[in-house]
Structure formats: structure tokens, C-alpha cells
């Protein structure tokens, strides 16, 4: 600071010396006072500056002291210089900044949505797992690939590439997958089993609508027509590739969780759950046997074997239906064996034995309708056309209910022959005798009266009793079991084979027929080589004469289809040794046959058709037939009753 003590005082004037001296002393005092105050101010200013500069006394300040100015010991002053971690921090930071890299990576443009995911979930997961930052270009510029910028260490960039490749490979179009017309749209078709198409669609289409809303795609179930053909149906999914893939997984999950049995009882077997399936063909009319009354039999098989059994839908034109068994292979095989044993026990109850008695059925081949009482049988009946609706019901509910209650299968023959009466409809009941009786009872309750039985009208050859229209009795001996071959409907006059009038359905008579069948004596050895059906004829007449309360002929050995005469063709002569006279049997047969013949044309009762001409032609054919099959002629039959 300036030293004001060297400043000379101001000079005084010469005039008024004494007074001037007194005035000069007053000025000096004022100057001294001002100088003193200036010094005090300067001292005060200098003291504040010294205090701020000496801020180290308070432990803080605006400027750090050099390490050398510190009052610490020398050992502590040297320690930071020997710290290896501290000395390495700057190089590590510089190395890290040098290792971060940015690389451009191309991905398919159609897979961008799949990579990003809903709400960015997929790309966030990739960045978190790889530690790499991913930036996708907003568009591809019309190119098939889009650029992605990957930023991170070389390891993280490689990890991100690997994850991206996995996602692209997973979302790569599968068979049936193609890009749609719209930008970024894709179409994929997956096959839905026919039995689960309704599950995917839902009631009124609600399920498929919910799937479309949840996945944000469009779904269409493709089928050729409204009829159910039993074939798998393609489900077409259209939308963003990622959403299409999600929708596909949702559909498969729906089928897995709700469409069938989980674990060992998975509905689709190897298609989804890894289980396998077996298809077992079942004769159409035997489906009711496998299902059982109210489904009891099929439930028992499923529970015992631990599988799922379903009948595949079909168009009803094949003679068999396919039972699909799904589950583990060993259990599927076990269930198939159970079903096969069930059918075999019903079919082969008495292999080669007689067919059901009481219906005059004499087939020369084995079939499902042959076997002891309790096996599968068939009963045909006709009802007026006006009462058909009472049996079928609205939407088939009545006939389904009767079938479920009785366990029998009931069918309306929809393709009658041209000569059928248009005012009558033919129904067929198939099942066990008990099931048929119960179904017949339920049907009669529905129509308010008895049904009109109709024997199976298929003509047969010489092996058997006089055809399906003969009097009640066991048919000719059957051969080993043959394929199921239902007889066609033919209500017209019988064919060239010998037939009699229709016989009433009498299932209760079957039990009485078999003892006589088994008790008959073997035929004459001399005739055994020429007539293989002699035993059948013997049983027939034994049963027939027992029903008529007449003694059966002694030692029967032949049938009318073979040489039965005395060698002269004359009924008046006694039969030679070893021959049997069946005159009485034929008389009784034609008496019964005549009772069933319609009235003459002149007065048809109740408008019934007159079959006199048909019966006359039938007798002529019968005579010609026996003349051909019998080398010595046939017995002379009594004249036909009046009106024939």
C-alpha cells in the first residue's frame, strides 16, 4: 500500500501569516485522521484476504495443497505412489473404451416382428442375455433383409448373433407357410384332427374368435363341404409371422390341454403327446356291442386299459367303422386285444354251428348273424310310412334314444328296391336277442301297435331249410365264420330257391332248437357223401314236428333237396328201406304256406296286393329246381290251396 507519510502537507499562503499558521494546523489534523482511517480500511481488507488464503486451518478450501505441503509423515506421502490398483485404473478405462465395437448384422425383413416380440419382450431378452445393444433399422428399403446394429464387446456381439440366428431359425417358414399378399403378412396351415375341429372352432365359433383376438391373426378352418368326412382339416392362419407362430402354439396348446387325455391318455397320441395310436376296424352293426348300453362297455375298456377310444366319423357308406385307440403303445395293444376278444366271443360263440332258429334263415356261409343265443342277430320289420317319423323323431333323437336304451342298432333302409311298397318303410334291428326284444318293445310303444316282422328276403340255394320264408326252425348248418354281408331288402316274391311264407320273429324258440340239433342221430352213411345237409334237415323236422305235437319221422337221412323219393317218383308207393316219406311234412308245410298267401284278386282285403301269379311262378320254379337237383325226380306235392 502507498505510504501516505511521505506526502508533504499542502503549502500555506503568505498572507495573514499568523492566521494562516493557525489554519494550517487544522488541515493537518484532518489529513491525519483521513490517513488513519484509510490505513484501517486497508488493514481490514488485507486481513480478510489472508483469512481466505489460510483456509487449510478449517479443513476445507478452494485449492488443494500439494502433497509435499502436507503435515503427514513421509511414509503416508509415498503410499499413493506405490498403489498398483490406483495406477492401473486409467489404463483399464482406456482398454474398455477401446474394446466396445459396433457391427452391422442382417436379418430377414419378415422376421423383424418375430425378433422384436410383443411389446419388445423378445429383443429385450436378447439384449439382457447377450449384454449387447441391438438397434434395428426402421425399414428395409424394399430389400429382403433389414440391418441391425450390434454394439458391445466382441463376445457380447457374437452372443447376440447366435440368439438372433436361433430365433430366425425357429420362426423360419414351415411347410404350408408362405407370405401373404399384404406387406409383412404370412400364411401357415396346420392340420387339425377331424375329431377336434369342433374344439378349435367352439360353439358358435366363439373359441376361434377368441384365438384370433388374442393372437391378432385371422384363422379359417378349410373343409370341402358341410358333411363330416372324417378327414383332418387344415386351419389357415394369416398375419404377422411372429403372431402366426404364436397362434399356432396357442391352437396346439388348446388341443393338448382340453382336447384329450393328458399323460397316458393323450387324445392325439404321437401327434402331440408322444403317445401312439391304433386303428381297429369294427363291423358297423357291431359298434353298439363295443360301446355297450349307455357307453358302459367302452368306458370299461378305457378304464381297464388306460387309453382313449373314439370312433372316427365317416359317411356311413363303408361296412366298418374305425375305432381309434390312443395312448401308450402297450396299453393301446391291450385295448385292441380286448376289443378283438369281445368281437370274437360274440362272433364265434359256436363256430360252424346253426344260425338263429325261429326265422327260417338257412345261409350256406357263416356270418355275424350265426351263433348261439346271445350272439348278434338281425330283425327286419316294416311300418307304414306315416309312422316312420314316430320312430326316428326330430333330428333322429327318438331312434338314438331307443338305440341307447336297448343297446341295439336300429337303421332305416334308405335304398329300397324298385318293387318295394312305397307306403311301407323297412327298419333293421341288429344286436343280441335281448337287445332286439327291448328295442322292438320300445318301438311298438312309440307307434302304438305291433310291428310287422319281415324275414330277411335273400334267396339261397339248396343248402339250408326252405329259405328265409320257411316255417320257424333252425337253418341249415353254417360254415365257419365269414365276412359280414347284410342281405339286401327284397320284399317281392321269392327267387328260384325254395321258400315258404314269412315266419314270425321268435327269439324265445332258439333255446329249444339247439338241444334237438345236438341230439340228432348222424345221417345214413350211404347218404352222407351226397347230402352234406342231411343232419340239418333232420334237426329241422325234429323241431318242426315237436312244435306241431306230432312224432318225428323215424331215422331221417335226407332232405327234399336230394333224392328223397322211392325211386319211382310216386307218392302212392311205400318208401323202400332206408328212405323216409316226407309227404306229411310237405302237406303241413304247404298248409302253413297257404295260410299266408294273399286272397284272390277278386276281393283283396284291405287293399293288400295279390301275389297269386307270383306264387304260381314260384311253384313252377321250385318244381323245375327240384327236377334239376334230384336225378330221380321229386315227390309229387299236393295241389296248392285255392287262390294260389
Swiss-Prot record:
It is found in: Nucleus. Residues 468-505 have a biased composition (Pro residues). Its main location: nucleus. Gene3D superfamilies: K Homology domain, type 1. The modification Omega-N-methylarginine is found at residues 321, 359, 361, 363. Residues 81-94 have a biased composition (Polar residues). Residues 14-27, 350-365 have a biased composition (Gly residues). Residues 556-573 have a biased composition (Low complexity). It comes from the Eukaryota. The modification Phosphothreonine is found at residues 153, 432. Keywords: Acetylation, DNA-binding, Methylation, Nucleus, Phosphoprotein, Repeat, Transcription, Transcription regulation, Ubl conjugation. One of its GO terms (cellular component) is cytoplasm. GO terms for biological process: positive regulation of gene expression; regulation of transcription by RNA polymerase II. One of its GO terms (molecular function) is single-stranded DNA binding. Residues 100-164, 185-251, 275-339, 376-443 form the KH domain. Ubiquitinated. This targets the protein for proteasome-mediated degradation. Residues 65-77 have a biased composition (Basic and acidic residues). Residues 1-31, 44-94, 346-365, 447-532, 548-580 are annotated as: Disordered. The modification Phosphoserine is found at residues 52, 55, 140, 630. The modification N-acetylalanine is found at residue 2. The keyword Chaperone does not apply. CDD domains: KH-I_FUBP1_rpt1, KH-I_FUBP1_rpt2, KH-I_FUBP1_rpt3, KH-I_FUBP1_rpt4. Found in a complex with PUF60 and far upstream element (FUSE) DNA segment. Interacts with PUF60 and JTV1. Regulates MYC expression by binding to a single-stranded far-upstream element (FUSE) upstream of the MYC promoter. May act both as activator and repressor of transcription. This is Far upstream element-binding protein 1. It comes from Homo sapiens (Human).
